Amino acid sequence: MKQWSAHTDDIKALMRTLRGDTPNVMKAFSGLAQAALTPQALDAKAKELIALGISVAIRCDDCIGFHVKAALDHGATREEVIEALGMAIYMGAGPSVMYATHALEAYEQFKPEAATPAA
């Protein structure tokens, strides 16, 4: 079982390195992310649930961790996450079923009641 909190921390550290090595590219990426995530017709929670569904459908584990955490931070419930995963499975078929289990595991580890494993 993947430890999602530690995994996303590792990716954040690598992204900081990448930001130092390719500042122009990462600045442009950050601008794109900020523009896409700014609430307009959809609120931040809905956007993160969409991003989570896409993460599952395209099989991006690293994306799953970040978007599960962000969805929770914006108040997503387990039921909302499950519904988003259902849409990802519908759009991505069998492989999305497997990656939906990754997202569910990440949800269980990131939710506030989850105990943090000892390092």
Regions found by a protein language model. Give the residues of each.
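Iron-sulfur (Fe-S) cluster-binding segments and ferredoxin-like electron-carrier domains
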Residues: 66-78, 104-107
